[in-house]
Amino acid sequence: MGVSDRYMVKWFLGSDANGIYAVAYKIPTILTILAAVFLDAWQLSAIAESDGDRQAHLRFFGRIWDAFASAVFLGAGGIIALSPLLIRLLAEEAYYDAWRYIPVLTLSMAAAAFSNFLGSVYVVTKRSAASFWTSLSGAGTNIVLNLWLIPRMGIQEAAVATFASCLVVFLIRLVNARQLLPFPLSGRKLAIGVTALLVQTLFLLFRWPGWVLAQLAGLAVLLLLGLPALLSTLRVILYRKQANV
């Protein structure tokens, strides 16, 4: 989706706008890369665990999802909060305005990471066709929204189109993948995490009064929300390692 975004930004808005968008896109991609490294290793474990007791497998899947989602939320919240500073440190001064597009693109990368985790369900259940058509639905949404929004509203709308398309894929997979493998997933935690990221994004972009406090509050909520799952999963991993020694 990122390739089509940049192509259309360049087509409609010119090379300068495309350069700013490309710089903004690079920082949230850190989240995607780290998630991809984890998911490559996770899929092997998910396949191996699928040969055992189904209920134990579902609990294992749910536990890993909880920890993964917590880590993604915390990573995304940190990138959003620090986006003006990150651009100042990592990009030339001419590209400083690129920070304005990082928060929405970070939301996109978080949604993409969640979609990729749910894609591991298709690997375990050998439903690769479902992975293809859900990805295709997101690509189609992205192209349509880019064609509609970018000429009218500019660079930020390319980021919005990317977020919307990643969200479409995630929501479709959330329903479809959990029909195939109904692992435990807390809708309440998911809603709280998404709300915290949206609050951070809106306060930062519009510089509403208390925007700094909103970043700190959002990160605190995400930490309180995710820390128990992260610590619990870490204990399980350490226990398994000790048991295998």
Q: Positions of the model-derived regions?
A:
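Residue-level recognition of pore/gate-forming positions within transmembrane alpha-helices
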Residues: 26-29, 76, 109, 135-140, ...
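Small-residue hotspots at the loop-to-helix junctions and early N-terminal turns
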Residues: 13-26, 98-103, 159
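Alpha-helical transmembrane segments of polytopic membrane transporters and translocases
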Residues: 5-7, 19-35, 65-67, 108, ...
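Membrane-interface helix-loop junctions in multi-pass transport and translocation proteins
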Residues: 16, 129, 136-171, 175, ...
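Membrane-interface junctions at transmembrane-helix termini in multi-pass inner-membrane proteins
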Residues: 106-137, 177-179
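Membrane-proximal transmembrane or re-entrant/amphipathic helices at the cytosolic face
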Residues: 202-245
